[in-house]
């Protein structure tokens, strides 16, 4: 029996049959199907902060302040988000609040590009 045939056979099982299969595999091999819980000693604070920064792959672009040129910042926000004029203006006016997220869950490079565009327009931006 090939691995593909085994997978096909498993796909045809009902939920109760799958539960029974898991139980028998646990008993046979002396293992558990529970998700492993990672327990590690607390690393040195400086090393932990550096590692956390490196591991982060998605960022939120947060508007801290629109600076002196609100109109230009609104134009850039519209360009980035595709929002209408009123929605972009409302978002820019939330600057400094937790709701002032221009874009969330974006890759690092895109987040940095957005930050650069907004800063060129005079805004103060933070990546979270």
UniProtKB/Swiss-Prot annotation:
Keywords annotated in UniProt: Ribonucleoprotein, Ribosomal protein
Organism from which the protein derives: Thermotoga petrophila (strain ATCC BAA-488 / DSM 13995 / JCM 10881 / RKU-1)
InterPro entries per record: Ribosomal_bL12, Ribosomal_bL12_C, Ribosomal_bL12_C/ClpS-like, Ribosomal_bL12_oligo, Ribosomal_bL12_oligo_N_sf
Protein name: Large ribosomal subunit protein bL12
Annotated coiled-coil segments of the chain: none
Gene Ontology molecular function terms on file: mRNA binding; structural constituent of ribosome
Pfam family, one: Ribosomal_L12_N
Main function: Forms part of the ribosomal stalk which helps the ribosome interact with GTP-bound translation factors. Is thus essential for accurate translation.
Domain of life according to the entry: Bacteria
Cellular component, GO, one term: cytosolic large ribosomal subunit
Keyword S-adenosyl-L-methionine on entry: no
PANTHER family noted in UniProt: 39S RIBOSOMAL PROTEIN L12 (PTHR45987), LARGE RIBOSOMAL SUBUNIT PROTEIN BL12M (PTHR45987:SF4)
Gene3D superfamilies hit by this protein: 3.30.1390.10, Single helix bin (1.20.5.710)
Family affiliation: Belongs to the bacterial ribosomal protein bL12 family.
Entry-linked NCBIfam families: L12 (TIGR00855)
GO biological process: translation
Subunit structure comment from the entry: Homodimer. Part of the ribosomal stalk of the 50S ribosomal subunit. Forms a multimeric L10(L12)X complex, where L10 forms an elongated spine to which 2 to 4 L12 dimers bind in a sequential fashion. Binds GTP-bound translation factors.
